[in-house]
């Protein structure tokens, strides 16, 4: 059976792993998922990630981050879905929790935070929000 929304699956696996306080979570790998994990690592929401395995069975191993026994990620929400894509220009870039969180945006120049896309004056598809 094929997966209809692999990004939502990745975010759900991260949420579920954090609810039971796991140190790491494994997700089927793709270039887009690796780019999202890279942005989350740069922003300090996860410790690290690595791609393991060979061609067809690559997995993304994400090491989760905790502070005072609480998850660093308070909320992880998918915004643009296969059934309803959400595209924004740089002037319409949403803010999360008045700047305390981030939105992850897929742009023609790659996957980046909404703030970076705003500074570079480029729009794109809003994939998810993290805070």
From Swiss-Prot:
UniProt KW keywords: Ribonucleoprotein, Ribosomal protein, RNA-binding, rRNA-binding
GO CC annotation terms, alphabetical: ribonucleoprotein complex; ribosome
Top-level taxon in the UniProt lineage: Bacteria
UniProt-listed GO biological process terms: translation
Matching Gene3D superfamilies: 3.30.1370.30, 3.30.1490.10
Pfam family name, one: Ribosomal_S8
GO MF annotation, one: rRNA binding
Family annotation (PANTHER family): 40S RIBOSOMAL PROTEIN S15A
Family indicated by similarity: Belongs to the universal ribosomal protein uS8 family.
Its biological purpose: One of the primary rRNA binding proteins, it binds directly to 16S rRNA central domain where it helps coordinate assembly of the platform of the 30S subunit.
Subunit structure: Part of the 30S ribosomal subunit. Contacts proteins S5 and S12.
Name this protein carries in UniProt: Small ribosomal subunit protein uS8
Gene: rpsH
């Amino acid at each position: 059976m094929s997966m209809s929304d692999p990004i939502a699956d990745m975010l759900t696996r991260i949420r579920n792993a954090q609810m039971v306080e796991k140190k790491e979570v494994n997700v089927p790998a793709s270039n887009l998922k690796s780019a999202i994990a890279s942005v989350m690592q740069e922003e300090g929401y996860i410790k690290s990630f690595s791609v393991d395995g060979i061609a067809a069975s690559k997995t993304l191993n994400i090491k989760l981050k905790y502070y005072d026994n609480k998850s660093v990620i308070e909320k992880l929400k998918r915004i643009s879905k296969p059934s309803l894509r959400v595209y924004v220009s740089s002037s319409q870039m949403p803010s999360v929790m008045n700047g305390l969180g981030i939105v992850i945006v897929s742009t023609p120049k790659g996957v980046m935070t909404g703030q970076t896309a705003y500074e570079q004056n480029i729009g794109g598809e809003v994939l998810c929000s993290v805070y």
